[in-house]
Amino acid sequence: HYWTGLATVEATYNNSEKVIKEFQDFYKKANSDPDGEYKNFIITASGNHEHRKQELFKMLDANGIEYFYPFSTGKIVNDAFHYQSNTNQSYTIEQDDIIIPSKQNCSVLAQTLFEPKTFLSDTMTYDITAWSLPYVFGLNAFAIKDEIKIGNPAKVVQQESTISFKEGQYGIIVEWGTVNSLKFLAQIMKQKVI
């Protein structure tokens, strides 16, 4: 590994102008004309569990993927791929929808994570190609081939919930079906709460 590392540094140094140009071209293309069938991905304002959206936004933030509110609402998008029904249908953009555009620095990653249909069938890469994030998080979402004018960045405030037991309480009801439900269950099991 040592010699391979040195050879890589030397090759990069010897081709530094070309390397810099390739990086610049990569980001210019990502922000102006990215590859891929879909131009935007929409996480709908309605029909989604808030905790699931929050978990998605945490993942997007951790990976540097930008997401925005729409510039205007009421636009009807035809031929939008609906993840949950696996069909193309019309969708009207709503005020609190979240748009993940393909045109951004992390274009390739965003498109990979939101691509509705897997193209690789190799079992060696199944774990990284099998699931698009709307499927992973169980979100109502659309993949759009059209350009959508984006508005302000959507930095969603993530709320931490706290639960405190009062004396005499002996139970609590937890909504099941979210990642947070699993985290809660894991924590109480660690604390040996029965």
Question: Could you say what each language-model-derived stretch is?
Answer:
Residues H1-I194:
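Intrinsic-disorder/low-complexity accessory segments
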